[in-house]
Amino acid sequence: MTDSIPHIPVLVKESLSLFRDRNPVVFCDVTVGAGGHAEAFLTEFPSIERYDGSDRDLSALALSENRLLPFKDRVRLRHASFEEVDTLTSDGTYDGVLADLGVSSMQLNNLERGFSFQGEDHPLDMRMDTSRGMTASEVLNSLREEEIGEIFRNYGEEPLWRSAAAAVVHFRKKKKILTVKDLKDATSGVFPSYRLRKKIHPLTLIFQALRIYVNQEGAQLKVLLDSAFRWLRPGGRLAVISFCSLDDRPVKWAFREAEARGLGKILTKKVIMPSYEETRMNPRSRSAKLRCFEKSFEDK
């Protein structure tokens, strides 16, 4: 499979509604991906004169560039992490900032990227930015058992993290873990029968943990939440879509802390989730949560 498989953006209507009374002029999308949200925002808001879209995934940026050709005079795309976006951004630049966290359908469907446990013979890569950093395979073959266990526990919240880490280290003594199938084989005896009978694949949490570690998603999210409030103009809004509690919790806490400090107010007192219709059409949207914060109109 290739990167041409389309990604279905989630909570698009709900995201647009959070900015409809603002008519943003300068907007930042720090996870532009294949350009789904960007296309919707640029269509909905003719007021947007500059749309800065960034992503760590070069293949996604190529798709986004093609998709956003009708808006090319209003779009500026950048290959950048959240940290790199921060170094490029002056305080008080944006009317709105959007972040759509996690892995995209496009990345999951491209089995060559190693994000999905369906790609038996494909390499365990899992890097958003394939130009830098350790692959998931390198992590599993080089780190100590205790370190691998901590990854499974801290980033996957996998109950059987000790057993899974021990199984990985035992397997790699005989054969390097290079492919998805190798990881499946390494952990084949870890999960009890009731986990195997569930709809959710038993390796889901292990794959989540490896992806988060490989891409340093926790550290990147911290950079975003420490920086994005500064990027906003007075009255500007930060909207964040998350797909797991490890992402949603820090967003919720950061918004609460910012509100307590008088930096602005939380607009989503009740977190926004996909409608039944959206989850039916796009099952991968079922865990999505959208939160939004509005910066105060007065400088603090």
Swiss-Prot record:
Which positions are annotated as binding S-adenosyl-L-methionine?
A: G35, G36, H37, D55, F82, D100, Q107
Listed under GO biological process in this entry are: rRNA base methylation
Q: Does the keyword Cytoplasm apply?
A: yes
Keyword hit for Transcription regulation: no
Annotated Gene Ontology cellular components are: cytoplasm
Q: What is its main location?
A: cytoplasm
SUPFAM superfamilies assigned to the protein according to its UniProt record, in alphabetical order: Putative methyltransferase TM0872, insert domain (SSF81799), S-adenosyl-L-methionine-dependent methyltransferases (SSF53335)
Give the UniProt subcellular location, in the record's own words: Cytoplasm
Catalytic activities = cytidine(1402) in 16S rRNA + S-adenosyl-L-methionine = N(4)-methylcytidine(1402) in 16S rRNA + S-adenosyl-L-homocysteine + H(+)
What UniProt keywords apply to this chain's record, in alphabetical order?
A: Cytoplasm, Methyltransferase, rRNA processing, S-adenosyl-L-methionine, Transferase
Q: Which GO terms describe its molecular function?
A: rRNA (cytosine-N4-)-methyltransferase activity
Q: What EC number(s) has UniProt assigned to this enzyme?
A: 2.1.1.199
Which class of enzymes does this protein belong to? transferase
- Write the protein's name: Ribosomal RNA small subunit methyltransferase H
Q: Which organism is it from?
A: Chlamydia trachomatis serovar D (strain ATCC VR-885 / DSM 19411 / UW-3/Cx)
Whichever gene encodes this chain, its name is rsmH
